[in-house]
């Protein structure tokens, strides 16, 4: 069940951000990929997944996941595209 939820969020975010799932799971620093990965991490955290589980799924450190979560609202204020990706991902997930 856990893996299916991660995959559903990953696929929904991939579709909303127009970034491949493989790119989101990579170490890419491209802004589009970072935005998509950040949205997926935020949604998973809101769903109750702990940073250590999210980190394992994305092959990141727990510290990098916490950093993403701690800075998400600040990035959201200055990045309207990030807000749109978040909204669209939530819509896609709500329709599943």
Indicate residue ranges for each PLM-predicted region.
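Basic, alpha-helical nucleic-acid-binding regions used in initiation and control of genome expression
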Residues: 1-96
């Amino acid at each position: 069940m856990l893996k299916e939820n991660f995959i559903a969020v990953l696929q929904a975010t991939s579709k909303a951000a127009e970034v491949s799932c493989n790119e989101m799971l990579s170490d890419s620093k491209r802004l589009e990929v970072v935005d998509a990965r950040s949205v997926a991490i935020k949604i998973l955290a809101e769903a109750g997944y702990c940073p250590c589980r999210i980190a394992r799924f994305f092959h990141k450190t727990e510290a990098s996941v916490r950093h993403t979560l701690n800075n998400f609202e600040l990035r959201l204020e200055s990045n309207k595209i990030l807000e749109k990706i978040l909204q669209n991902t939530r819509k896609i997930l709500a329709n599943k």
